[in-house]
Amino acid sequence: MATQIKLKAKRSTKLPKGFKLSGVKANIKYKNRLDLALIYSQEPCQSAGVWTKNSVQAACIAHNKAKIQNHIHAVMINSGCANACTGKQGEENCDKSAEALAKVLRIDSKHILLASTGVIGAQLPMPRILKAIPKLVAQKNSNKDSIKLASKAIMTTDTFPKTFGITCKLQSPNDLDSKNTSGKEKVARNEKTSDSKNIVINTESKENAKDSTSVENKLDSKTQEKETCDKKAKVEKKNNKFRIFGMAKGSGMIHPNMATMLGFILTDIAISKELLQEALSEINTQTFNQISVDGDTSTNDMVVVLANGAAKNEIISSKSTDYEIFKKALKKVCVNLAKQIAKDGEGATHLLEVSIKNAQSLQQAQTLSKAIIGSNLVKTAIFGKDANWGRIICAMGYSNASFDASKFNLIFASKKGKIAIVKNGVGTAFNENKAKSILSADVVRILIDLQDGTHSAKAWGCDLSYDYIKINADYRS
């Protein structure tokens, strides 16, 4: 039977070791607004990324795909201008931005990634950005204010900054082995001590005090060795802790075929580049790819993970217990950020969570849940607090994920209670007023049991309100 791996994590407001952030006002689109951010690590980082699947991609995406194979020291993010559909000049502006930042940081520009978000089609205001870079670098810090400034600087129509961090503990097989070894050594030590006493008794009976003294010296020596080992173990135990922190932006144009948004995950864990990329790719499909606000996939989407190894753990280079723990930590951070983005959907009044369980496969569960939260008819029903479950079934039906429509159960739930709506594929009589009350909560859950397997998945979205139209109609003004 496989051992259940549990994540030991505590909420943390501190950045991972070795990272610094900053955010300044460069007046890129608006005056007196934070719009340029920096992520920096003095130690070189292993990096991994996932990128938009939109065939029209911003200049920064091409830049990053070319640089991500290198060790990364810095990421510079601007808001207010997407630098998409900007041609050769847009590409040159990326190069100029990276070179200018590299000069101030005194590193090679190949170690720098870039990200942009904002209006498509406009060129970056390079004089303003170049002027702001020295200040951006000078203000980099690891304190709470730097987190606040950087997370605000990457926002566009977001109503709040989105960050989340945790401190975790690794539990590698080596640690378990050391515990077992320690126990065995203790037994052996007791046996040796017992033998030593017998030796002392025998030698005393022979009036051989020198042998007794020799045995006592050996025991003292072993005690000193034990104390030294214990001290080393304590040091190693401290090195098992690592931090992981995430910062994201996203409110509109959210329907990922990757992660429709900007996401930056920082960690001080030591891990190989190959496993870092594999972990991000896997977790991304379960988190950022499972959110939707409006069905639009951006030209600038990206999620990047940087790992600088400052935690000084033994490098994770195989799919060990430590790797599984890291994946759980990464997922915890990504789920939190994904839910924050869905909650902050433009004009949203409800966070919508769809949970599919007992599916035939993970793919089936993910596809069905994503289809439901992506349905505009479902979104508007939630906005109107209308328990129109037929729209949910309709979305499931056109999702291209086959399922047995005669088996599933459907429940609406929130902090105000829960109510069964469908049983074995057939609608049940329910109290409309109770359903309306449940759907009036700020977080609404649609729970679907397919009763056809063992797999599960979740997706997150929001309702579609009148304000969504107003916000996007006025976006360029």
Where are these regions (language model features)?
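A structural signal for small-residue-enriched, beta-sheet-centric alpha/beta enzyme cores
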Residues: A2-N78, A82-E92, K103-P127, K131-D175, ...
